[in-house]
């Protein structure tokens, strides 16, 4: 019975769908073509910020037809809650020289902007050939530092969102769409 109630609560916390799986895939296909045109024949390194962007990264790299390499960083500013701590902790850094690449940081969501600005500045200091940011979701009304992505697929209102790699307490990452997380349950 306890497992049933836990599953029921899990499902009840999935709020309204904000962006469908089909909308996500269509937009990623568009962005893949943009990246193809921007970097034709030049060395690209897609840098995924874990954990949230891993699903987006997988789909985006398949939508790009020009050769690209991938790398990962893990940064945390949320520690099993719904509010950012305000501190950026680099849990895993990239393991290569990026000075011979055009680096595209692939992010799941820009919220306050603190985490991404911190990572952007770290990467910029390592002298890539160029540096751009692509984010799946952009929550501008929560921004506390000035930072904009070069490409933002979807602007979203100030909801805590789950799905398509985004989580709450490590759950809901496997949803194929973006939904509002119901905190009131």
Q: PLM features: what roles do these ranges have?
A:
Residues 1-185:
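PRPP-associated nucleotide enzymes
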């Amino acid at each position: 019975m306890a497992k049933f109630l836990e599953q029921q609560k899990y499902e009840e916390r999935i709020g309204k769908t904000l962006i469908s799986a089909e909308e996500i895939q269509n937009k990623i296909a568009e962005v893949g073509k943009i990246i193809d045109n921007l970097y034709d024949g030049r060395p690209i390194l897609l840098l995924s910020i874990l954990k949230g962007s891993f699903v987006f990264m997988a789909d985006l790299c398949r939508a790009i037809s020009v050769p690209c390499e991938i790398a990962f960083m893990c940064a945390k500013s949320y520690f099993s809650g719904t509010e950012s701590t305000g501190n950026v902790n680099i849990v895993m850094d990239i393991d290569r020289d990026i000075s011979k690449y055009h680096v595209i940081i692939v992010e799941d969501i820009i919220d306050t902007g603190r985490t991404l600005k911190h990572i952007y500045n770290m990467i910029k200091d390592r002298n890539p050939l160029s540096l751009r940011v692509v984010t799946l979701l952009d929550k501008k009304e929560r921004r506390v530092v000035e930072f904009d992505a070069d490409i933002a697929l979807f602007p979203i209102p100030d909801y805590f969102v789950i799905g398509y790699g985004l989580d709450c307490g490590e759950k809901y990452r496997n949803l194929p769409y973006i939904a509002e997380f119901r905190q009131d349950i």
